[in-house]
Amino acid sequence: RDELASFLSATNMRADGYGQTLAGRLRLPLDVYDAVRGRVGTDFPVGCRFLADECIAGGSTVTDAAQIAVAFARAGMDFLSLSRGGKFDDALQPKVGEAAYPYTGPSGYECMPQYISDERGPFGRNVDPASRIRNAVRAAGFATPVVVTGGIHGYAQAEALLREGKADLVGFARQSL
């Protein structure tokens, strides 16, 4: 995930055709998709999980993610799953001998807020970005399902999101335990 996310990032300034412009940043992820699709055929679902917002200075935003989503839908991906944050760019420096951990900075909080959240949330922190990205995909003429994840606190909220057309699928695990 992190390697391809690095290529998609607005911070990717590679000058070898795999960065700088949106087309350049999309090049490797689309090449990977084409290779996977070529191996598994059309009767196997292939999609992509990517960041709706990197939540770092100069990083990709929801507007960027909407353009990425449309490109992925155009390429034929079967679903688009959205997350956010969790970047090493703003993580705290590890102590000597310890591994770097991406969930210690502001973008980490956006990805894994349970470390400092409480009964007030944040709940459904990816709903608005996912809905905006889904709307962009639909406006471009694609019906590619969009998966919302992140802070969905239960089945009632998940059902409401589907009923309201804010997402096509809801991904959560911990909440169902």
Task: Pin down the residues of each PLM region.
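Flavin-dependent oxidoreductase catalytic cores
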Residues: R1-L177
